Amino acid sequence: MANIKSAIKRAELNKIANERNAQQKSAMRTLIKKFEAAPSEELYRAASSTIDKAASKGLIHANKASRDKARLAAKLG
């Protein structure tokens, strides 16, 4: 465990950020699974939006975002 006050604070902030990132990635995966179960234009837009947001925040690589969106689009039509 950290002894320095700033290190303790950084550790706590890292924990909070880690939880937030995990929650956002989980939400993205959930929307992708919902779309794959029942493809529709509305679910495609929602999944695509969450993928773009994850990529812009650095949660996933830009190439992965592009690949995921292409796979969803292929399943849509």
From Swiss-Prot:
Keywords: Ribonucleoprotein, Ribosomal protein, RNA-binding, rRNA-binding. The gene is rpsT. One of its GO terms (cellular component) is cytosol. Pfam families: Ribosomal_S20p. This is Small ribosomal subunit protein bS20. It comes from Lactococcus lactis subsp. cremoris (strain MG1363). GO terms for biological process: translation. Gene3D superfamilies: Ribosomal protein S20 (1.20.58.110). GO terms for molecular function: small ribosomal subunit rRNA binding; structural constituent of ribosome. Binds directly to 16S ribosomal RNA. Belongs to the bacterial ribosomal protein bS20 family. InterPro entries: Ribosomal_bS20 (IPR002583), Ribosomal_bS20_sf (IPR036510).
